[in-house]
Amino acid sequence: MASKALLTKTLERSSYLAARFGLRYFSTTLRFHNKQQNDDSIPWYMRSENTSQPEQIDEPLFEDLPENLPNKVKDLLTLLVAKYGLSGVKVIDLALLPTDHPKSLDRQSEEKIVVIASGKSEKHIYKASYDLKQHIKHDWGFQCAIEGMVTNSMSAVERRRLAKRARQGPPATHNEFGINPNTWVRCELPDGVIVHMMSPERREALDLELMYDESIKFNDDSNGNPYTPYNQYLSQNEKLDQSSIFYGLRREFHTSSTTKKTKTTTTTTTTSSSSPSSPQQQSKSTTLDSVYNDFLQEHGDASADVYKARFDKEFSGNTIDDFNRKFLFYKLLHLKSPTTTSLEDVTSTLLDKYSAVNIISQSDDWNLEIVQDVIKYLELLIDTPVTSIDSSTKLNLLSDFIGKVAMFATDDIHLFAIDKFQVLLWALTTNKVCPITAAHVNSIIESKGQTLRVGGSVASIANTPAGNTTANASVATNSLDTRIIENTQGARDVRELLRSVNYDKRGKMPLWLREQMLFTYAQSRNWVYFWKEWRAITQSLQSPSDFINYFVKTLVLLVMVNDKTALKELLSTYWHRVDDGVCFISEFEKNGKQFEDNNQRLALKTALLLLDEAYPGDLIFRNAQNFASSNL
């Protein structure tokens, strides 16, 4: 009865509402009667004259697009503008740049099409970059590399570090420019497509479009070498040899080489902000240089104590240059006479500089001084003639040295941003410097293979007809000890550290660092990691000519190492394959059976003929020799 009474009351209430507001009652819906627009019973905010008209959304139009732009890129531009809301889209086809432009395809092959766009805010850029990453992953089937995209979440470790940094106060070089996250996001897509998403302020400040302007030229230094950012940390006499795989790694310094040096005034590494020296200090510096140069001309180590006492007498330690000169002199003493000056004595010359109170104000950038000293100390550990110090000890000494000098840093020190530091750090993982370097390999190829070593022998093939490169070859027993000892645990730790740093900062391992590791693995006979790096490097090569060039270099390296198993692996697995795998014969045919130059062709021919002579009767080497005789 109660429910029936409630239902009756509800129906009465509905009838009242229908009569009061002009509503018709249905079982499931309520709707208004159609009334005139000027009816006063319609609220003002529901009248048609007060309703905004929908805006017409036009399809995005792109002006001045490069010709022959791939359809995938056009679809990408529509996605960036229509769906992600980016504006100011600019597309640059690097194939249209002049051949002498530093970003042209003739000088680099990583970037082909560059897209630059602006976002409304940092959150907008983060959302657009995240959606673009997911779109490329699912629609293109490619895991793209993105730099600069930082999530808003923060780990507990980061919060503790920020709190600790806040208690210390702002650094002396505090600068807010560029530190905000998601103001510049770079996305690397397949087929050389690079997308830059920036905030309007960051885009105006960086002006990336200027870098791709057709009028830009190389910015060379005074020696004609292309400028690189890390060169600012190096003195003029330490510029990197970029043509070498081991660029930045100096040749092994030993006692016999010091007597061949000409008398030159020493050049020390100083900071640009050092205070000017007085005439008396300049006279002292000249005297120290004179002692250094006089000792450099000595052909024995009997007078090392005399020169050391003479230098210490003239040393005042009033300038940073004095300490740098002392380090160079003590290092020379150590290299020529380790018994006179120990490694600890040379290390003390670097550490004493930071305990000298009178030179604190002479440099405005002690971070730069610390970076230079770390590089110097690394070179010292590599060049030291003391064989009793193994790789593990050197790595521990380096760690201890960095820990001591880093206490004097005014801001964060980014050593791994310097390529030379990575090169020298990897060199510490062996008991000595690799005797075979890229300079050796390049010189052999330039000499058409005339100085190629096989099994510790030197093949002199001068004045030999091109068709008979091994005839009348005089073989001398000038042995070359190519075997080195690798610190397995240290190499593993350094390798993983370098991989982590480079993948975080660059998205990949640089080719020159992979090649340095490859040379180390070959001379330490670590063939498991050697072939792993070989496959990784060959997969990153862009053209058949690059593969041919790299194959010839690898063959020359293995001939000098003279490991029969590795040579047979190269000339069987990677010489000719029946499947679709990359190999020399297939890439040689793709390249029109052409080499980079005649020197490369003759170097390959010489290496194959010498292998057939060194291992007579072996079918693998005989087939390679037949190819060289008939095709090269």
Swiss-Prot record:
Pfam families: RsfS
Transit peptide: 1-26
Region (Disordered) residue spans: 257-287
Subcellular location: Mitochondrion inner membrane
One GO CC term on file: mitochondrial inner membrane
Keywords: Membrane, Mitochondrion, Mitochondrion inner membrane, Transit peptide
UniProt topology in membrane: Peripheral membrane protein
UniProt record, GO biological process: mitochondrial gene expression; mRNA stabilization
Free-text function comment from the UniProt entry: Probable mitochondrial mRNA stabilization factor.
Name of the protein this chain belongs to: ATPase synthesis protein 25, mitochondrial
Gene name of the encoded protein: ATP25
